[in-house]
From Swiss-Prot:
Keywords annotated in UniProt: Hydrolase, Metal-binding, mRNA processing, Nuclease, Nucleotide-binding, Nucleus, RNA-binding
Subunit text: Interacts with RAT1; the interaction is direct, stabilizes RAT1 protein structure and stimulates its exoribonuclease activity. The interaction also stimulates RAI1 pyrophosphohydrolase activity, probably by recruiting it to mRNA substrates.
Keyword RNA-binding: yes
GO biological process terms on file: cleavage in ITS2 between 5.8S rRNA and LSU-rRNA of tricistronic rRNA transcript (SSU-rRNA, 5.8S rRNA, LSU-rRNA); deadenylation-independent decapping of nuclear-transcribed mRNA; mRNA processing; NAD-cap decapping; nuclear polyadenylation-dependent rRNA catabolic process; nuclear-transcribed mRNA catabolic process; positive regulation of termination of RNA polymerase II transcription; termination of RNA polymerase II transcription, poly(A)-coupled
Residue intervals passing through the bilayer: none
Protein source organism: Candida albicans (strain SC5314 / ATCC MYA-2876)
Cofactor stoichiometry and binding remark: Divalent metal cation.
Functional note: Decapping enzyme for NAD-capped RNAs: specifically hydrolyzes the nicotinamide adenine dinucleotide (NAD) cap from a subset of RNAs by removing the entire NAD moiety from the 5'-end of an NAD-capped RNA. The NAD-cap is present at the 5'-end of some RNAs and snoRNAs. In contrast to the canonical 5'-end N7 methylguanosine (m7G) cap, the NAD cap promotes mRNA decay. Also acts as a non-canonical decapping enzyme that removes the entire cap structure of m7G capped or incompletely capped RNAs.
Catalytic reaction(s) noted: a 5'-end NAD(+)-phospho-ribonucleoside in mRNA + H2O = a 5'-end phospho-ribonucleoside in mRNA + NAD(+) + H(+); a 5'-end (N(7)-methyl 5'-triphosphoguanosine)-ribonucleoside-ribonucleotide in mRNA + H2O = a (N(7)-methyl 5'-triphosphoguanosine)-nucleoside + a 5'-end phospho-ribonucleoside in mRNA + H(+); a 5'-end triphospho-ribonucleoside in mRNA + H2O = a 5'-end phospho-ribonucleoside in mRNA + diphosphate + H(+)
Binding of a divalent metal cation, residues: 174, 225, 244-245
Identification of the protein by name: Decapping nuclease RAI1
Amino acid sequence: MAKSLPLNSRSKTTALKQPRELFSYARDIDGKYVYDDPENSLSYYYLPDSTIDTGIDLQGGYSKFKKIPDEQNLADFNSLLKAIIKYETSEGKKISSDIITFREIMTKILSLPYNLTDPIDLYVVPFDGQLFIKSDDELDMKRRKEQEVRMKQTNTVERYDYMKRCEYVGYKFETIATIPKPWSQVSRSQIENRNKKVVNNYEQYLSVIRTGIGNVKLVLAGEIDCCWDYLPDEQNKKLNHYVELKTSRIIENNSQVVSFEQKLFKAWCQCFLMGVTKIIYGFRDNNLILKNVELFNTEEIPILIKNNPLTNAATEKKINCTNALKWYGAVVDWLNTTVDKKDETKSYRLKYDPVRKSFTLSETESETNEKLRNGELLTPEFTEWRQSLKK
């Protein structure tokens, strides 16, 4: 029997526990995960105005793009659980948390009140007194492939190629806007030759943070694009130095303002959840030339959206970050109280259906539960590790 949470559910509190980084790990150019000295994989932002003014072509190097296959670029629980084992080994105890998942999953939930057209399909697995939440990767991949087919069928060859180049520009912007170490440790040639560097989306630096809303504690893993200035030694101060990088088309009319506001809201969701304080947008024209760069402080975005005169009509569509946060709080609290975290005989499917406008939680079939507990989410290594902590 499925249980439903009405879409108008809102928590009374938006009290958020200040996110704190617990540890980090990384993925290298070969797609292998790195657990020792992951800071070596962190990039640093450096893009002076004089460089921006040169009119950088953000589709440059497109034909050489080293793109990771989509199947290998899903939120990977195997690597996260290995990183958790390493952290718990050093701490000598289990991470204190009610929910363990990836930032991108919670971003979908947080942004749902203003993104009612996209389906959500997740698995919730109770284990060792905690809820582990992952995407239904098989269904996600099926949808991605269907979307790709639709893009090809509904666009000319030229238009399809342009759309793929638009996807590339975000990675290109990251490449030309960052350096591998703090500025003082990087050679002039490294800085000047960034535009010639082969772009890839294999390399990732991932931060794992503890946060919470209301009475629920969460551990979230999410990709960090780069560091603003330097990385402090104190673990609990690192989040203030991280930056999210984004690209968007330059804004030339009112309808584009509304479209950008929706993008900015999604970026706010991503960064707010992780405690990332800065978002840098690279704005490009229709020819994919970088025209200007703008810095947004995460904490100021709700006010920017609220005070936008172009969307200030009193409608339900008007984005309200506090309203989204109250929905997120209601979902997290509902999961935490509805699912028995000690019952390891069951797993659940959490589903948002955009056609029925329903948000439901239902038990999976026993076969699915077995798969999730034996490699698809939980790994034998992690299960054994947690058992050893009880001895």
